[in-house]
Amino acid sequence: VDKRIYVAPARFSGPRGQGGQEEGPLNGLRLVVKDLFAIKGERIGQGNPDLLASAPIERQTAPAVLALQQAGADYRARTTTDELAYSLNGTNGHFGTPQNPRAPLRLPGGSSVGSAVAVARGEAEIGLGTDTGGSIRVPSSYCGLYGLRPTHGRISMTGLKPLAPRFDTVGWMTRDLATLTQVSEVLIPETTATRLPARIILLVPEGLAAGPYQRLLGPLSRRLESLGFQCERRMLSQAFMARASEAFRILQGCEIRRTHQAWLNTPEQGPESRWPRLNPDIAARLKWCMTLSDSDEQAAEAKADTVRRWYRQQLAASHEGGETACEDGSAAAHTQAEATSEAVFVLPTTPGASPLLGASLEVMEAYRHRLMGLTALAGLNGAPQLSLPWLTDDAARLPEEAAPPPWGVSLMGLPGRDESLLALARMLED
């Protein structure tokens, strides 16, 4: 058993198909679960050995896990997470970094890293995790998986250790869309009538080098138009993405400070300290969270409001000539704007393929800001986002890599439109 991936193996070595606790639509599908969920008889470690050692044994299983088991899923193992789920890299200095099965020279992505790698290796069909700032979407992109961040608040977070409750969601990853849809039907049972959008907005991030994503847009537009959708292209300015990233980073930091204040407010060292041993990068981020003020939070909230207004204006109504994420980060609609039907965004899940292993902290921090310029959009809006393994990053491929590394493309919609994203993806893959 690879301890970089698995914290508490259950029946990991058994054959597939022996069933879960119940007969149901997920019968015979192996389930692995991120080390943030309560599972009866196990401890929650949150990616930290000190927290694991001091954690109580759980008396109940989290409702999200229990729902999958009752639908027939076969729970196999608890999987590793980046420490406190506060990273998108898939690294953990305590337990090691799991190898990305699709790109061994590159990061696997986090923080739901163990679940992603287990599924990508074929050791499970369902990888349950969480997504706050991208922890389902990013490893899905890097490992070539399907991954869904559902609408915030749609699935119970009971029995989970939080990071930033305002943004935390349950999420899941699979190797195929059919399984992802099956899991969605179990975890999002209160399904309303699926409303397909009339418009698809193809977002092109400013500064994204010409390559696989842009080459996809032509054939994708033709395919969508053949299915009756109206396609529009819009640019995401660097200034707008920076505004979204910074707003999310500060609001998330304020939430994290409140989540962990019981021990963050104690001395870092000495007899009164309640701090666990932390990796240096995570410790530095937590210390930064402690510096945030009420005025910082208010300023970030104002920035987030501009992002939210733009998001809803884009998706809730079409505009003659379109609407652009302007250089100042505001949403500027043309005066002849006319409300019609809803839309869905298409965008790259990440700025490209996964970064290489061994990149410096400075390089990774700069990359994290670019990455969060994309992932923050769903987080700030409480919106669903579906990452699809439709691309490989040919331009990033190194001579020593056997194949081009994976790169995800996302569908992203208004809150509550999770089923619409899944239905649209099925239409495009048929």
Predicted regions and their residues:
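Gly/Ser-rich catalytic/binding loops embedded in alpha/beta enzyme cores
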Residues: 1-124, 321-327, 334
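Glycine-rich, small-residue loops and helix-cap segments
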Residues: 295-430
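General beta-strand structural signal in soluble alpha/beta enzymes
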Residues: 33, 75-80, 128-130, 233-234, ...
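Charged, often glycine-rich, active-site loop that binds/positions anionic groups
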Residues: 89-99, 243-259
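Structural helix-boundary/capping segments
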Residues: 121, 126, 132-207, 383-430
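Short, hinge-like loop/turn segments at secondary-structure boundaries
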Residues: 93-96, 144-147, 250-251, 363-365
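Gly/Ser-rich, acidic/histidine-flanked active-site/gating loops
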Residues: 31, 185-254, 266
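Short helix-loop capping/hinge segments that flank enzyme active sites or metal/cofactor-binding pockets
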Residues: 29-49, 250-305, 326-329, 333, ...
